[in-house]
Curated annotation (Swiss-Prot):
Principal location class: virion
Function: Self assembles to form a helical capsid wrapping up the viral genomic DNA. The capsid displays a filamentous structure with a length of 760-1950 nm and a width of 6-8 nm. The virion assembly and budding take place at the host inner membrane.
Subcellular compartments: Virion; Host membrane
Signal peptide: 1-23
Membrane topology of this protein: Single-pass type I membrane protein
The protein, known as: Capsid protein G8P
Segments on the Periplasmic face: 24-44
The protein's assembly and partners: Homomultimerizes. There are several thousands of this protein in the phage capsid.
Amino acid sequence: MKKSLVLKASVAVATLVPMLSFAAEGDDPAKAAFDSLQASATEYIGYAWAMVVVIVGATIGIKLFKKFTSKAS
């Protein structure tokens, strides 16, 4: 019983180790695609922050304009 369990475990390890090392080698197209997606997302986040600054600045400007025009009237 114990030998059978050890034999099964060693066979499982012997089949998994080459598969894991094969998966770690070479250029992975999925990794390249994910890296490209991550670069695009970073670029879009930069654009979004620029838009946030513009929108917040415009909102503050409009509120200040309304405040000063109501006091001037």
